[in-house]
Amino acid sequence: MLHTIGILIWIIIKIIVIVVPLLISVAYLTYAERKVIGYIQVRIGPNRVGLKGLLQPFADLLKLITKEIIVPTRSNKYLFVIAPLFALVPSLVGWAVIPFQEGVVLANINAGVLYLFAMSSLGVYGVLIAGWASNSKYAMFGALRSTAQTVSYEIAMGFALVGVLLAAGSMNLTDIVNSQKGGMLHWWFIPLLPLFLVFWISGIAETNRAPFDLAEGESEIVAGFHVEYSGIGFALFFLSEYASMILISTVLAILFMGGWLSPFEGITFLDQIFFIVPGFVWLLLKISFFLFVYLWVRATFPRYRYDQLMRLGWKVLIPVTIVWLIVTAVMVVAHVKPWF
């Protein structure tokens, strides 16, 4: 009995250790986004609350918490209230299988990739329920767009994952990272470059970020699926979007960029200099790079038209992944060095 209680307490501690830094990261990702986009647009960005505006995320949180929650008169009130949780929970529970370093993982399951793919697919239900329950044409349009977009890009994303599974020979995320040992030239992003790019683009579309933010489409359908939300409901949708961004960036780093592995493995003089850097620091640096590109893309590219979005998913990304899956299978059978 005491042993079981001890295990439960340990699991709860690990969950807290993962979730609390994640929520803080989400808060400061919003700050980083406003600063980066401000710099790109030759503006200052938030700089009033705290030193250099560093307390701005907490001011935003306080504002959203204290706002009134308005439930539309003819909406389905029960579904309207719980929809943000349907969107948020999948973006948090996906972290259960993420290895931050060798052995540092909440649940080291052998089907980690499959679990992650399943969790990333569930977020769209929150968007769809929110759009339908709001009883608003703008919200419903946004929800339908998001559903079609997710279905389209998940196929390409799934095929890209199959390429990694072929190359690494495992669905365990720790094994996938360990299969990339030997330095930067052994990472999967080199032999699987088209799949890496497809997964990256699909990840941006999956999180409804610009230039694939048709589910929100401020200039077309006001704010899309969350047009009727205010206060904490809006904050939860906001939180789920940014948590999903961090999760997709982490998965990219693990599957294609060596996870916590140093890029200087095998280069003796550099390895001797950087061997003191812990593995999770390398992982954080890679995640930060992908997040910066998320922000850079938002500030740079205009929104796609809906037909362009569908055409890109079905006529470009899916054919590319199918072709490169065949190429990957040939490389695996032929044992192309140094990767296979």
UniProtKB/Swiss-Prot annotation:
Record localization: Cell inner membrane
Class in the EC hierarchy, top level: translocase
Annotated keywords: Cell inner membrane, Cell membrane, Membrane, NAD, Quinone, Translocase, Transmembrane, Transmembrane helix, Ubiquinone
Bilayer-crossing regions: 4-24, 78-98, 113-133, 151-171, 184-204, 244-264, 273-293, 316-336
GO biological process terms, semicolon-separated: aerobic respiration
Domain of life of the source: Bacteria
Membrane topology: Multi-pass membrane protein
Annotated Gene Ontology cellular component terms: plasma membrane
Record keyword RNA-binding present: no
Role noted for this protein: NDH-1 shuttles electrons from NADH, via FMN and iron-sulfur (Fe-S) centers, to quinones in the respiratory chain. The immediate electron acceptor for the enzyme in this species is believed to be ubiquinone. Couples the redox reaction to proton translocation (for every two electrons transferred, four hydrogen ions are translocated across the cytoplasmic membrane), and thus conserves the redox energy in a proton gradient. This subunit may bind ubiquinone.
Protein name per the record: NADH-quinone oxidoreductase subunit H
Species assigned in the record: Legionella pneumophila (strain Lens)
